[in-house]
Amino acid sequence: MSNHFIDVIPYLIEGIKLTLLITFVGVAIGFVLGAITGLGRLSKNKLIYGIATVYVEIIRGTPILVQILFIYFGLSDLMGINLDKITASIIAIALNAGAYIAEIVRGGVQSIDKGQREAGRSLGLTPSQTMRYIIWPQALKRMIPALGNQFIISLKDTSLFSVIAVGEVLYQGRQYASTTFTYFEPFFMIAVMYLIITIPAMLILRYIERRLDV
């Protein structure tokens, strides 16, 4: 008699590899997009502010599952773009995380005392130099807890990609369950696998927070 707790592990390990790939690449792109959008939300240029705000509100106002289906099926139908599943998944995570990171960036920058900008001007720095050398380093330190939480949220959101048959952890577990007709063991081990990833991530985040005293 097979031990399904053990037998399912190779399937889930394959899923973890893809889960981590999508998460790291997607969140990295999302951070760049979020930083640009967050600064756009602080811009005095109405066009830049408007574009950034529309993007953030659309993403935050719609479920990520809808975003996944729209990117994978909707764009293919509308524009004739045949995205492969992994590319579509990375785009979805990047766009979703980017919107939330934009608000983290906006809040982090706004949390810095305005006197810091005045100090930059008194030193002869341009607004962009003040942002780069004075505001941004301080703001980034304050953003770390929220950015870490967003990474964990995005990691867990990858489970939704099973709806487009991306071979991440949940999909692999479901495939095993459907072929062996056992459900408790695979889904229990799926939960364990997510905890194996997220608990160390949370511990690392707390360690960084303590080191930086944020």
Language model: regions and residue ranges:
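Transmembrane alpha-helices and adjacent helix-loop boundaries
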Residues: 1-214
